[in-house]
Swiss-Prot record:
Gene3D superfamilies: SLC41 divalent cation transporters, integral membrane domain
Protein name according to UniProt: Solute carrier family 41 member 3
InterPro entries noted in UniProt: SLC41_membr_dom (IPR006667), SLC41_membr_dom_sf (IPR036739), SLC41A1-3 (IPR045349)
GO CC field: mitochondrial inner membrane; plasma membrane
Catalysis performed (reactions): Mg(2+)(in) + 2 Na(+)(out) = Mg(2+)(out) + 2 Na(+)(in)
GO biological process: mitochondrial magnesium ion transmembrane transport
Keyword annotations from UniProtKB, A to Z: Ion transport, Magnesium, Membrane, Mitochondrion, Mitochondrion inner membrane, Transmembrane, Transmembrane helix, Transport
SUPFAM superfamilies attached to this UniProt entry: MgtE membrane domain-like (SSF161093)
Transmembrane segments: 41-61, 121-141, 163-183, 194-214, 225-245, 258-278, 351-371, 380-400, 424-444
PANTHER family found in the cross-reference section: DIVALENT CATION TRANSPORTER SOLUTE CARRIER FAMILY 41, SOLUTE CARRIER FAMILY 41 MEMBER 3
Gene: Slc41a3
Length: 462
């Protein structure tokens, strides 16, 4: 596929045209043509793999919630959604940036590829270290407000576990993302479709496992008071090294200067989802909350990240920052246009929506097979769960269309500014809607049991 771009520049003095310049560029690189079937196949398999990974992460969380450290340090449960969401934000924005670079041919040159990869990885490490610490602080603040306890030993444990988890997970998943994007480019597959969900298939599991292991290790060595502060300071001390590496790529340095607000705000949004999780996970009417939360949050986040990355790539290929194509001039498009038109981004939105119900049914069935009676499996709950999953994705896909247009109009990169907000909102929506499903199911079953009891009492002869 050959991409041809014509750039015109007019120079005026007053109202008179004094000169102009014309630049024609042709590039053999670009997005390969995709049919609905090819898009569905490319997206479906990675989404299923990511769902299995998130399901495994849910099973892990269902197990570790009973560990002594999670019972004693309640704020660890509040930390899970923002920390998992942070991992998702960093890896999804990294995947989206690398996919855009791959589709525009920027990483085909070996020297340029090394510069782009090293600087992107360094930026992710800086963001992971700093925001990992901020996530722990946010969890502590929310926990202090709710149960008014403050223990310096637990503060140090929480901060150190969060920083190490964010650092190691970002490093491992960043390397994985790089391999996936380069491999996808070589095999002629659109990285936008597969990079994010494949990384997510291991991301949640890796993040939760590292958090559980690190927090348990420091909890078992809590008598050595200097251990946690020393380790935390050591990881923070590596930050200048990552900044030095990132400086080799000036466009990436802009992310370090201006890309903090989306990541931090997304972390704060996810923290409220974590607060909901910590308040509901131990109550009997929310049985199964721990195992289903990573699935519903992860599926919604992955689907909206894929759509955002595709729209961003489309704009990078066919427009310039600050200028929206004719068919995308409206900031608040009609929802029918977003989901029902023949435009390429609308087609991909329909494909992603089509995957929601079958995907959730498969994951729910597998969870019930593994967990058995520990997960509510009534018909009412399954219906409510599917409705919640569909509602979450519809809202996120529409907001993705709106936010990408707004950020592009402001000459901002949607890869860096949209995905964090949307995945953070996806975590909050997913956790809230899932808790509502459990609550409605409990109320409806309670009413049905009450009606059955009343009918039995009425039918008993005096």
């Amino acid at each position: 596929m050959v991409v041809t771009q014509l750039s015109l520049e007019f120079r005026f003095q007053g109202k008179k045209l004094r000169g102009f310049s014309c630049e024609l560029t042709r590039s053999p690189h670009g997005v390969l043509p995709e049919s609905v079937l090819s898009t569905t196949c490319q997206v479906a398999i990675p989404i299923l793999l990511s769902g299995l990974g998130m399901m495994t992460a849910g099973l892990v969380m269902n197990t570790v919630q009973h560990w002594p450290v999670f019972r004693d340090v309640k704020d660890l449960l509040t930390l899970v959604p923002p920390l998992v969401g942070l991992k998702g934000n960093l890896e999804m924005t990294l995947a989206s940036r690398l996919s855009t670079s791959a589709n525009t041919g920027q990483i085909d040159d070996r020297q340029e590829r090394y510069r782009i990869i090293s600087s992107n990885l360094a930026v992710v490490q800086v963001q992971a270290t700093v925001v990992g610490l901020l996530a722990a602080v946010a969890s502590l603040m929310l926990g202090t407000v709710s149960h008014e306890e403050f223990d310096w030993a637990k503060v140090a444990l929480l901060c150190t576990s969060s920083v190490i988890t964010a650092f190691l997970a970002a490093l491992a998943l960043g390397i994985l993302m790089i391999c996936i994007v380069i491999g996808a480019r070589k095999f002629g597959v659109n990285p936008d479709n597969i990079a994010t969900p494949i990384a997510a298939s291991l991301g949640d599991l890796i993040t939760l496992s590292i958090l559980a292991l690190m927090s348990s290790f420091f909890y078992s060595h809590r008598d050595t008071w200097y251990l946690t502060p020393l380790v935390c300071i050591g990881f923070l001390a590596l930050t200048p090294l990552w900044i030095f590496i990132a400086k080799q790529n000036p466009p990436i340095m802009k992310i370090l200067k201006y890309g903090w607000f989306p990541i931090i705000l997304a972390m704060i949004i996810s923290s409220f989802g974590g607060l909901i999780l910590s308040k509901t996970i131990s109550k009997h009417q929310f049985k199964g909350m721990a195992v289903l939360t990573p699935v519903i949050c992860g599926v919604g986040g992955n689907l909206v990240a894929i759509q955002t990355s595709r729209i961003s790539t489309f704009l990078h290929m066919w427009s310039t920052p600050g200028v929206l194509p004719v068919q995308m001039k409206r900031f608040w498009p009609n929802p029918c246009f977003t989901f029902c038109s023949s435009e390429i981004n609308s087609v991909s939105a329909r494909v992603l929506l089509f995957l929601v119900v079958p995907g959730h049914l498969i994951f729910f069935y597998l969870i019930c097979l593994v967990e058995g009676q520990s997960v509510t499996s009534s018909k009412i709950f399954v219906l409510l769960y599917l409705m919640a999953g569909m509602m979450q994705v519809v809202i996120l896909l529409y907001l993705a269309e709106v936010m990408v247009r707004l950020t592009w109009h402001q000459a901002l990169d949607p890869d860096n500014h949209c995905i964090p907000y949307l995945t953070g909102l996806g975590d909050l929506l997913g956790t809230s809607l899932l808790a509502l499903c459990f609550l409605l199911d409990w109320l409806l079953r309670g009413r049905a049991n009450l009606a059955e009891l009343v009918s039995e009492l009425v039918s008993v002869p005096p």
